[in-house]
Each structure stands twice: as structure tokens, then as C-alpha cells.
């Protein structure tokens, strides 16, 4: 659709019907809006944050999960809702058709993702796939698998053998950053699971990913989101 607009406008210019192609802009500037740029961290900050996690004796156990968040653009509620059956290693993709939430009454519920179609597939890089495989290998199987609205096999469980939720990860990110900033003079800006998502989107747009493909992977209803 976008390419058709470009071609059609170029024909109008050639025939002197219009003076300038209204679609002759950088798509990068459309996809990554101001809020995304503002919240995303730089590639250098991302690498430094991940390095610190990987080398820290306590926080290293969260490295694989946080690497995945930086390199898939998943919403944290979608990530928490992932089960073993959502990982397709053969086709190197992640099925995203639900998200896990915990209500103020501490009730665990499964909801549909924000994506209009209700389902999408997010590609896995070799590094992301390796992270998932390590997570599955290190996962301690509980005596009784927790079930939420008929779903089982959640990748991350808390000390009570219940699925981890967004709040868990937000606290982990907070503690990691606090420790980092207590050690290094150059402070790390706020980094949350949502910042990971924005950073992935920004990185992919800057790398030249097809706009419609990026829109699909992110689960956005509009390219400009």
C-alpha cells in the first residue's frame, strides 16, 4: 500500500500534477515517534546494562529473560504469559496469543493481547532461542504445575510456584539499576520492561526493518504508534 502511494505520487510529479511527493519521507521517522525515542536507551546503554547483569553474581539469573525482552519487543504481560507450547524452535518463532495479568485482588487471569488479530508470531534470533532453551533447562518443575484459565507450563514461577507477573520484573529491573548506579559514576537511566520494548522498536526501525513487518511484530494497530 505504501509503495503504491510512492509510485503513484512519482507519476503525478512526472506529469506535473503535483510539485512534491507527499510520501517521500523517511519511514524511520514515522515508526519511531517522539515517545519511543525518549524512552528507548542507546545500544551502548543496552549492552552495558546486559553486561552488568550477566557478570553480577546475583542478577545473572535474570540475564536470559532480560535479553529476550530487549530482542523481541514483547509486552511484559505477554512475556509473563508465555508457556512451553508457545515456543516454536523449529520455525524460530514465538506465538503470542494471550497475556497474563494479576488483579488487585491477587487473582491470576489470562487476557487476549492488545493486537487486533488476537494472535501474532514474533521471530526468534539464534541468541534469543539459546536464551529460551537455557530457561527451559534451568526451570525447576513444581510439584503441581499452576494453571490459569486452563493454561499451564509458564516459563517463570515465583517462590510460591505461581507464575511471575509484570510487578516481579519491574522490581528486578529497579534493583539492578540501583545496584549499577551505586557502583558506576556514569548513571544508567531508568530501564523497565517497557523501555526494553521501546528500545527494540527503535533499534529495528533504525536498522531499516520493513514498517509493516515491525508493526506486526510489535502488535501495533497503527504504524505511527
Residue ranges, per PLM feature:
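Single conserved hydrophobic/aromatic residue that forms the stacking wall/gate
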Residues: 1-8, 13
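Detector for glycine-centered tight turns/loop "hinges" at secondary-structure junctions
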Residues: 16, 105-107, 161
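Basic, Lys/Arg- and aromatic-enriched nucleic-acid-binding interface segment
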Residues: 18-76, 80-82, 90, 117-119, ...
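Conserved tyrosine-mediated DNA breakage-rejoining catalytic core shared by Y-recombinases
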Residues: 27-30, 45, 82-140, 147
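Catalytic-site neighborhood detector that most strongly recognizes the C-terminal catalytic loop/helix
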Residues: 32, 40, 99-100, 218-225
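Short, basic (Lys/Arg/His-rich) helix/loop patches that form interaction surfaces
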Residues: 51-62, 122, 138-147, 151-154, ...
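A short, basic/aromatic helix-end/turn motif that makes direct DNA contacts
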Residues: 81-87, 215-221
Amino acid at each position: 500500500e505504501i509503495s503504491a502511494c510512492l509510485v503513484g505520487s512519482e507519476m503525478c510529479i512526472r506529469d506535473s500534477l503535483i510539485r512534491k511527493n507527499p510520501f517521500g519521507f523517511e519511514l524511520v521517522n514515522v515508526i519511531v515517534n517522539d515517545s519511543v525515542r525518549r524512552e528507548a536507551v542507546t545500544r551502548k546503554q543496552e549492552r552495558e546494562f546486559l553486561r552488568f547483569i550477566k557478570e553480577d553474581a546475583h542478577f545473572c539469573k535474570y540475564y536470559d529473560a532480560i535479553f529476550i525482552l530487549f530482542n523481541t519487543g514483547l509486552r511484559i504481560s505477554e512475556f509473563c504469559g508465555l508457556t512451553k507450547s508457545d515456543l516454536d524452535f523449529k520455525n524460530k518463532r514465538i506465538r503470542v496469543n494471550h497475556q497474563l495479568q494479576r488483579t488487585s485482588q491477587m487473582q491470576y487471569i489470562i487476557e487476549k493481547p492488545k493486537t487486533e488479530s488476537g494472535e501474532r508470531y514474533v521471530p526468534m534470533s539464534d541468541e534469543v532461542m539459546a536464551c529460551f532453551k537455557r530457561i527451559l533447562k534451568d526451570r525447576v518443575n513444581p510439584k503441581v504445575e499452576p494453571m490459569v484459565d486452563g493454561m499451564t507450563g509458564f516459563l517463570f514461577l515465583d517462590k510460591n510456584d505461581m507464575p511471575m507477573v509484570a510487578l516481579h520484573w519491574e522490581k528486578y529491573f529497579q534493583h539492578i539499576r540501583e545496584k549499577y548506579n551505586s557502583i558506576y559514576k556514569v548513571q544508567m537511566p531508568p530501564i523497565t520492561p517497557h523501555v526494553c520494548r521501546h528500545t527494540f522498536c527503535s533499534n529495528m526501525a533504525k536498522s531499516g526493518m520493513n514498517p509493516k513487518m515491525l508493526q506486526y511484530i510489535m502488535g501495533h494497530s497503527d504504524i505511527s504508534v
